[in-house]
Regions:
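Walker A/P-loop nucleotide-binding motif
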Residues: 58-78
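Residues at the beta-strand->loop junction immediately N-terminal to the Walker
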Residues: 65, 94, 145
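A short, basic N-terminal segment
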Residues: 2-58
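Conserved NTP-binding/hydrolysis module of P-loop NTPases
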Residues: 28, 88-90, 98-117
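Mid-core helix/loop region of P-loop NTP-binding domains shared across ATPases and GTPases
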Residues: 20, 99-102, 114-158, 166-171
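Canonical AAA+ ATPase core
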Residues: 167-183
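Walker A/P-loop
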Residues: 74-88
């Protein structure tokens, strides 16, 4: 068996961080897991974070839109990290095939609860948990649905019904949908 041609050979010299060492960098640039405190805080990012914080404070519905790769999810990470943990409970779901049952299950699990099996029971359970969270713990729930452009009609209807609380007189949570702009 012959050895591969030399142009297919990869040699790592100096370990996996040779790039950082060569350019005297503290961190790998443009990595997906960049800490949000290291993000460049442009005026546009500050405005988006301000609007999202307003939506969280007022328990509103918000939609974050943008093209693929423009930093929607990174912005959401920055937003989540900017919120006061003693005032807000952030729940995040990203599932292209999210069903209403799995939606409630995912949120209730993030609250430390085992979800009821039936969708209606799980919805009522979530409303009770939110009332306890707000009344006893004084936490405002913030639900973030990433990749929401992939949700089907049934799931979008369920989200709409979830926000109808106390005969539509109160929003039980801030809801933020993160969607890809149509191509």
């Amino acid at each position: 068996m012959s050895s591969p041609p030399p142009y297919l050979t990869v040699r790592l010299i100096g370990g996996t961080n040779m790039f950082e060492e060569f350019y005297c960098l503290k961190h790998t640039p443009f990595s997906r897991d960049i800490p949000t405190e290291h993000l460049y805080r442009s005026s546009m990012l500050e405005e988006i974070l301000g609007r999202l914080e307003y939506a969280a404070r007022r328990q509103l519905f918000a939609v974050v839109t943008g093209d693929c790769g423009t930093g929607k999810t990174t912005t959401i990470r920055s937003f989540k990290n900017s919120l006061n943990n003693s005032r807000y409970m952030v729940m995040y779901l990203a599932d292209s095939k999210l069903t209403p049952r799995h939606f409630y299950k995912g949120l209730l699990e993030q609250l430390g609860c085992e979800a009821k099996f039936y969708r209606g029971d799980a919805k009522r359970q979530l409303h009770r948990e939110i009332e306890l969270m707000q009344g006893i713990h004084h936490l405002q729930p913030v639900v973030i649905l990433d990749e929401a452009h992939l949700l089907d009609k049934e799931m979008l209807e369920e989200v709409r019904f979830l926000l109808n609380f106390r005969m539509d007189s109160k929003s039980p949570m801030a809801l933020i949908l993160v969607v890809l702009m149509p191509i």
